[in-house]
C-alpha cells in the first residue's frame, strides 16, 4: 500500500491543485472516481497488464471513458498512461478525495458503538468532535456488541476508545505489568 500511495500522491496533488486553480474540484472528483471504476473493471485489469503501448492504452482508456472526461482530464490520463501509472487511478481518486476534504475543512469519523446511538447523542458527539478537531465532521456509525458498552471513535490515526472492552483490556495490561 505504501508504494501505491507514494506513486499516486504526486498525481493526486497535481490534479487537485489544477482543480482548485480552475475552480473545478467537484468535476475532477467525479472524473477521477469514474476512471477508478474503469480501472477496477476486470476486463480493464487484463488490458492494463497486457503488452500494449502507452499510446494504445491511453486511446483505449479514453474510448471507454468517452464523454466522462473533459480535455484536461483526457490529458491527465495520457500522462498517466505514458508513465505506466493508469493502474494507480483508484488510489489517486482516494487521495484526491482526502485533499478535497482537507480543503473543505471536513473529516470522516468512524464511530463504533456497543448499541445504536440516538439522534441527540450523535448531534452531541458531532458538535464535540467539530469543536475539538476544528473541522466539519462526517460521522460513519456502526454497531459492535463485543464492545460491551461505550464506543470507539476513529479519526485518521487518532483513536478514542471509551468502550468497556477497551477499558478492560487496559486494566488487564496494567495488572499484568
UniProtKB/Swiss-Prot annotation:
**Membrane disposition:** Peripheral membrane protein
Q: What does this protein do?
A: F(1)F(0) ATP synthase produces ATP from ADP in the presence of a proton or sodium gradient. F-type ATPases consist of two structural domains, F(1) containing the extramembraneous catalytic core and F(0) containing the membrane proton channel, linked together by a central stalk and a peripheral stalk. During catalysis, ATP synthesis in the catalytic domain of F(1) is coupled via a rotary mechanism of the central stalk subunits to proton translocation. This protein is part of the stalk that links CF(0) to CF(1). It either transmits conformational changes from CF(0) to CF(1) or is implicated in proton conduction.
Keyword Ion transport among UniProt keywords: yes
Which proteins does it associate with, and in what oligomeric form? F-type ATPases have 2 components, F(1) - the catalytic core - and F(0) - the membrane proton channel. F(1) has five subunits: alpha(3), beta(3), gamma(1), delta(1), epsilon(1). F(0) has three main subunits: a(1), b(2) and c(10-14). The alpha and beta chains form an alternating ring which encloses part of the gamma chain. F(1) is attached to F(0) by a central stalk formed by the gamma and epsilon chains, while a peripheral stalk is formed by the delta and b chains.
InterPro entries attached here?
Answer: ATP_synth_OSCP/delta_N_sf, ATPase_OSCP/dsu
Its protein name is ATP synthase subunit delta
Q: Which species?
A: Psychromonas ingrahamii (strain DSM 17664 / CCUG 51855 / 37)
Q: Which HAMAP family match?
A: ATP_synth_delta_bact
What are the record keywords, sorted? Answer: ATP synthesis, Cell inner membrane, Cell membrane, CF(1), Hydrogen ion transport, Ion transport, Membrane, Transport
Amino acid at each position: 500500500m505504501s508504494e501505491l500511495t507514494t506513486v499516486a500522491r504526486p498525481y493526486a496533488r497535481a490534479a487537485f491543485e489544477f482543480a482548485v486553480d480552475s475552480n473545478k474540484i467537484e468535476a475532477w472528483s467525479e472524473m477521477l472516481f469514474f476512471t477508478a471504476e474503469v480501472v477496477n473493471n476486470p476486463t480493464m485489469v487484463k488490458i492494463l497488464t497486457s503488452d500494449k503501448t502507452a499510446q494504445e492504452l491511453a486511446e483505449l482508456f479514453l474510448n471507454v471513458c468517452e464523454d466522462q472526461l473533459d480535455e484536461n482530464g483526457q490529458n491527465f490520463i495520457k500522462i498517466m498512461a505514458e508513465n505506466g501509472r493508469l493502474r494507480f487511478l483508484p488510489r489517486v481518486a482516494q487521495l484526491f478525495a482526502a485533499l478535497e476534504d482537507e480543503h473543505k475543512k471536513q473529516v470522516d469519523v468512524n464511530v463504533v458503538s456497543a448499541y445504536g446511538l440516538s439522534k441527540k447523542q450523535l448531534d452531541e458527539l458531532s458538535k464535540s468532535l467539530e469543536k475539538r478537531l476544528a473541522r466539519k465532521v462526517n460521522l460513519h456509525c456502526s454497531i459492535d456488541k463485543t464492545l460491551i458498552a461505550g464506543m470507539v471513535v476513529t479519526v485518521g490515526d487518532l483513536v478514542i476508545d471509551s468502550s468497556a472492552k477497551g477499558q478492560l483490556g487496559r486494566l488487564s495490561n496494567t495488572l499484568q505489568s
